[in-house]
Regions:
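Non-catalytic DNA-recognition/assembly elements of restriction-modification systems
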Residues: 1-19, 139-165
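A short beta-sheet element
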Residues: 58, 62-112
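A short glycine-rich beta-alpha junction/loop motif
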Residues: 84-90, 125-151
Length: 165
């Protein structure tokens, strides 16, 4: 099985779509956790305008670039539902744009590895507030098998998860 090295930034695209028309409401607001899942927001949303919130469409990712005080984990989640969410403008939202090269579920498996948490912490910059920037995310070098092999790995992983539940 041959692997090909890519820069992640060549395979993903930043999304800056905002909820500018208030299409999405309070029930669509989510947060992400260090368990790498979307969660209900814990913020007091009373009187908060949702127009600057970023749109997280199905199959999109959202992460918090600030890595300080996160238990050495990065806060990132993959929208694996058919629903569209909105997140605070402090998040970075992106999607896999080269779907013929990279499977989004395979990428999420990559993000769930402890090695990725260590990588993102090591490449976070700042003093009081360390940040894993979009540029650092794009600079990641990732070795990928063919898209068919990626999909097989994802299928095996999901089958293992289903057997555990």
């Amino acid at each position: 099985m041959a692997l090909t090295k890519y820069k992640l930034g060549d395979l993903i695209t930043l999304s800056e779509e905002k909820n500018s028309e208030n299409k999405y409401g309070i029930d669509d607001v989510k947060g992400a956790s260090i368990r790498k899942i979307f969660i209900e927001t814990k913020a007091n949303m009373s009187g908060v305008s949702l127009t600057p919130y970023l749109v997280v469409k199905p199959d999109y990712f959202a992460y918090v670039p600030v890595t300080s005080r996160n238990g050495n984990k990065i806060t990132i989640a993959h929208n694996e539902t058919n629903n569209t969410y909105i997140v605070s403008s402090s998040y970075i939202v992106f999607y896999v744009s080269s779907t013929e090269i990279l499977d989004s579920d395979f990428l999420f498996m990559y993000f769930n590895r402890p090695e990725f948490d260590r990588y993102s912490r090591y490449h976070s910059w700042g003093s009081a507030r360390e940040v894993f920037s979009w540029n650092e995310m794009c600079a990641i070098e990732i070795n990928l098998p063919s898209i068919d092999i990626q999909r097989k790995y994802v299928a095996v992983f999901k089958a293992l998860l289903a057997n555990n539940n």
